[in-house]
Amino acid sequence: MLTNHSVGSTRPSRVMTESAMDAEFFGAPAWAWVQLCAAVFAISTAGVMFQQLPHVPPLLLASWRMQATALLLAFGAAREWRVADGDVRARWFKTWPRLGFSGVCLGAHFGAWVAGLQTTTLARSLLLVCTTPLFLAFGALALCLPTSAGELAGAALGFCGVAMVASDRHDGERETATWQGDVLSLGAAFYIVGYMIVGADVRRWMPLCLYAGPVTAVAALSTATLSYLVEDTEGSGGVLGWAFSGVSSYFLVTMYLALVPGLVGHTGYNAVLKHISPLVVSTSLTMEPLLGSALGYAVGLADAPGWRTGVGGIVIVASVVTVIVAKGRNPR
């Protein structure tokens, strides 16, 4: 039985914990940085999991991932809609064109990336899909948006790091690099820019699932439609094959992709965009090649990384720290 003294003693501890998580570090709450770290680790497993189903057409596989994630997000979106006030609901309806655009960008990102994963090495695909900070940084310059020199330098440093990882053993016993796969992966990095910019803006007032749910549903619909038109979907059970084909690996891999890289990873990124700049969030993705390549080697899908991967990984981490510190010193 808890005495009054013991109950009272637990309250300061709880308050101190909550205060610590709400404390700001480099211009954002501590919990946002913790969630960002969890998202990085979660999303780093996606490449390996996509490669568990190499015979499923890429657009179809991307659509499966989006379908499962959209179903999970629907529960949160319904709850947020019930408690939303009239102003939020009205603004949400007016934002639909932008949500649709964001969803198409997200679908294009995953479709191109899965195709890249299936046609080039894991390390190269992971590094090229993480060059988004360059598109954001130089896009900000072109549009005359406020971006600090430190953020730009960190983004460029991150590119140098992932370039070193990419230069390490292009071909090996298990993998072969192709320029087609490289171009697809680079295209995936470009397509996600629209998704991140829209999210950074509307997430300032829109609840998380009311944004991520519809956007993911649009991504699922767009990739499923394109897959049906240009791919042989029947061999994998059709557009809904992950749920109704009877192949357990289809269901298990798809649900993992939805729960871990999907909810913990990409939805986690959306959650912190309200507090952390898109350039910082996207630059954190530059850790994915190192983590994803190491995981691929550990499970026997990728070749052993060499010294360039080690040095490149150090450069990548340094670039992340550079951008975070620069953002904290130059809050916008």
Give the role of each language-model region.
Residues 2, 10, 73, 77, ...:
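Hydrophobic transmembrane alpha-helices of multi-pass small-molecule transport proteins
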Residues 21, 66, 167, 235-240, ...:
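C-terminal-most transmembrane helix of multi-pass membrane proteins
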Residues 64, 125-131, 198-220, 258-298:
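Helix-helix packing/entry segments at the starts of transmembrane helices
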Residues 1-63, 76, 104, 108, ...:
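Glycine-/small-residue-enriched transmembrane alpha-helix faces in small-molecule transporters
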Residues 60-71, 114-149, 188, 278-297:
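Specific alpha-helical transmembrane segments that line the substrate/conduction pathway
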Residues 42, 47, 74, 78-129, ...:
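Specific transmembrane alpha-helical segments of multi-pass solute transporters/efflux pumps
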Residues 97, 126-129, 142-164, 175-182, ...:
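Loop-to-transmembrane alpha-helix entry segments
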